Amino acid sequence: RKYINYYGVKCGNNVVIFTNNDDAYETAISLHNKGVKIEAIVDIRSRSDGDLPKKCNELGIKILWKNTIVYTEGYKKINKVHVMELSNDNSSTIRNKLKINCDLLCVSGGYTPAVHLFTQSGGKLTFNEEKYYFHPKSTSLSQISVGSCNGTFSLKKIIEETQTKTNEFLNLTHNNQYNITESKSGNFENIWL
């Protein structure tokens, strides 16, 4: 998405996007708006009530819900993906393979907190069992972690968390009120096959 939005670089002409979250749909919309054909979005989830998948439906982008990519083909570059439907419990694939021609496969697994500097400074991590990522737990230094490095990814929640934690850290009582509008996003889902 950054290549096409910031630099105007098209990495492929026929794209398949594989995802477990709504953020990939923003990539699909960006590519579509720049003239790139989205062959399909392959989503392991059974559905999403987010705004971005709805927008992709409006644009006529094909969404394969509760599917996964099981194989790719190509020589020196990708030219095809094989897709299969997931079983009800997500433990296996079912039905026949669907083969989709493409010259680019985009993969979106969601967000992971950027904890590199935190751990380099001696900070300890904890694992979030619900969202499947490590995030800051404790540190011996006088520091705070907010936003994506703390596992907060919604813009509204990042601003609220930043204000609350900064005020606590600096012993401030003043609160600014911000009016933040963001699109509705569906949940992400992890899978282990």
Model-derived segments and spans:
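Residues forming the flavin
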Residues: 1-193
